[in-house]
């Protein structure tokens, strides 16, 4: 998960391709791409000339500083997951993060492990997984997320899709049963599910816990609702990151206050989900209403930490609104009429693919052109 910095009406600070701002390997100052470009050197010493269109925003914040700040905001979420699911939550998060770090260290650029991006990817991937998933699957998902979600595109700032969600999509396709088996909440925080220790590619044998359906699964397939208070505090079944919605909102508000997060994207997502679900509920009361749709599943985690990835989200503010509205609308459609109970992952990945087109359509007119003069007239 990478975050962005708002920049007025023109756009926000990016790491896409890292042309606007590149932190040198020796820890030196940021290099800003000017109107005609800014020269620099890669970690291997090869001279580079970075070219990028405006806006060019100067900031004292380095990439590692932003990344590790985001990691710090995930600590309360991880603590809540551990409280509800026991030590298995920490093991799953550690396995996913380890997979990310090993591939980053082996195949990534020298020194890239220290920027914190691989740690964020591993933690966010782990938060999308059930607590009882075998650890080797979580590790494999982390390796896939970095290898095929980030490095194959050229590394940090070059990827098209959110790496954590791409890793989750891979696990969903490869191991659908494990990804849709939700263990019951742990009776104590020291609990470890036996299924975590299953050997690779072998049957885990008997499961030592009773499984439970997620609130979305109960609503979609059994037409049973879940108490809104339980949804708010996270006392329900689901992925690790589905149990700390209130904490995620608080942490997201802090990131927005620090201007490390483009608040327009989550606000647009929540607005779209609330508006469409409320409208459909008014037309057909048997469908879930806006409060349930907002609090259930991974919507809050996806809106705050996944969709706001600066590399895979639009540059302009108008584009951010369009991006967020699209995610919210698609999420509701998949939840109500799709084959799966949850649609946040696929909606974000789908809108990731449209980001270049959104950027092109909402790009501000070049200063001095006829279109720009009409806008300022």
Describe the function of each predicted region.
Residues 2-104, 371, 375-377:
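N-terminal signal-anchor module of multipass membrane proteins
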Residues 117-118, 123-194:
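Membrane-interface helix-loop-helix junctions at boundaries between adjacent transmembrane segments
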Residues 100-111, 146-157, 250-259, 304-313:
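C-terminal ends of transmembrane helices
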Residues 163-248:
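Long hydrophobic alpha-helical segments that form multi-pass transmembrane helix bundles
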Residues 72-74, 98, 116-124, 139, ...:
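Hydrophobic alpha-helical segments embedded in the membrane of multi-pass proteins
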Residues 85-98, 132-141, 235-245, 287-299:
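Structural signature of hydrophobic alpha-helical transmembrane segments
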Residues 338-371:
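Membrane-helix cytosolic exit motif
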Residues 160, 164-165, 290-298, 320-322, ...:
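Loop-to-transmembrane alpha-helix initiation sites
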């Amino acid at each position: 998960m990478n975050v962005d910095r708002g920049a007025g009406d023109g756009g926000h600070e990016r790491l896409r391709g890292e042309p606007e701002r590149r932190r040198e390997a020796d820890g030196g100052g940021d290099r800003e791409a000017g109107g005609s470009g800014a020269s620099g050197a890669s970690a291997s010493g090869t001279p580079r000339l970075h070219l990028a269109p405006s806006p060019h925003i100067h900031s004292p914040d380095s990439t590692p500083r932003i990344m590790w700040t985001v990691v710090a905001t995930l600590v309360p979420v991880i603590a809540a997951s551990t409280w509800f699911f026991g030590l298995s939550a920490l093991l799953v998060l550690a396995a996913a993060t380890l997979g990310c770090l090993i591939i980053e260290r082996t195949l990534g650029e020298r020194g890239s492990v220290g920027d914190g991006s691989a740690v964020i990817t591993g933690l966010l991937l782990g938060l999308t997984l059930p607590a009882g998933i075998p650890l080797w699957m979580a590790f494999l998902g982390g390796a896939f997320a970095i290898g095929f979600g980030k490095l194959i595109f050229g590394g940090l700032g070059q990827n098209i899709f959110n790496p954590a969600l791409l890793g989750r999509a891979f696990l969903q396709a490869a191991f659908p049963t494990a990804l849709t088996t939700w263990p019951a909440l742990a009776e104590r925080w020291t609990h470890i599910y036996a299924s975590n220790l299953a050997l690779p590619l072998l049957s885990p044998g008997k499961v030592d816990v009773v499984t439970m359906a997620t609130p979305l699964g109960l609503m979609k397939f059994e037409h049973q609702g879940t108490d809104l208070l339980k949804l708010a505090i996270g006392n329900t079944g689901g992925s690790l990151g589905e149990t700390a919605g209130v904490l995620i909102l608080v942490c997201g508000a802090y990131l927005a206050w620090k201007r490390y997060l483009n608040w327009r994207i989550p606000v647009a997502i929540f607005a779209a989900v609330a508006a469409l679900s409320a409208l459909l509920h008014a037309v057909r009361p048997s469908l879930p209403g806006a409060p349930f749709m907002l609090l259930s599943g991974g919507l809050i985690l996806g809106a705050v930490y996944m969709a706001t990835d600066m590399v895979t989200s639009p540059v302009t503010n108008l584009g951010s609104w369009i991006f967020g509205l699209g995610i919210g609308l698609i999420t509701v459609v998949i939840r109500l009429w799709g084959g799966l109970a949850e649609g946040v992952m696929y909606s974000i990945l789908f809108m990731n693919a449209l980001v270049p087109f959104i950027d092109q359509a909402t790009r501000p007119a070049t200063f001095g052109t006829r279109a720009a003069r009409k806008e300022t007239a």
